[in-house]
């Protein structure tokens, strides 16, 4: 997969800038990259982006994903993860996006947390759009991805560097 151009849309300018620098370091300037700041909660902004740039493929990775934080802020998890995903799906469908890939999580399998529930609902939205639009939609589930923001791996690394112990969020959790 080699895109003709790449559009990075993120609410956090620092993360978007870091990604831009990483892409330019690894791939040079062979692929034109445009960075835009905005939120998937803002349907109007999404429509502006789709109308201006006409993307054909969307990789959707935006989400609140820290399990303990979402347990104490469940409404924010729903607004960002579920409603934001719905906004993005609707805008993509309205602007003739051909393929939509949602990055999900292993926590969406028989969810036991607010975050897991929101991601499972997002997967169900993906299934609905896949069955009712011309857009090819898929959700892919990942576990803890090394080097990703919000992964438990950096926490484990820091605990190990300090000599332990390595702790889990819940003593009953199995990983």
Predicted regions and their residues:
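A short helix-to-beta-strand connector/capping loop
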Residues: 28-33, 133-135
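Conserved Rossmann-fold cofactor-binding substructure of NAD(P)-dependent oxidoreductases
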Residues: 34-57
């Amino acid at each position: 997969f080699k895109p003709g151009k790449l559009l990075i849309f993120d609410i956090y300018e620092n993360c978007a800038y870091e990604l831009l620098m990483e892409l330019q370091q690894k791939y040079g300037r062979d692929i034109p990259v445009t960075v835009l700041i905005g939120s998937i909660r803002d349907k109007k902004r999404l429509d502006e982006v789709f109308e201006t740039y006409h993307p054909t493929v969307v990789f959707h990775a935006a989400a609140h994903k820290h399990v303990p934080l979402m347990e104490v802020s469940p409404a924010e998890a729903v607004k960002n993860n579920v409603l934001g995903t719905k906004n993005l799906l609707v805008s993509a469908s309205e602007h003739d996006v051909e393929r939509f890939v949602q990055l999900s999580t292993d926590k969406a399998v028989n969810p036991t947390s607010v975050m897991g529930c929101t991601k499972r609902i997002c997967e169900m939205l993906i299934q609905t759009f896949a069955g009712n639009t011309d857009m090819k939609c898929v959700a892919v589930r990942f576990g803890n991805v090394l080097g990703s923001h919000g992964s438990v791996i950096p926490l484990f690394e820091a605990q190990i560097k300090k000599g332990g112990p390595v702790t889990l969020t819940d003593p009953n959790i199995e990983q």
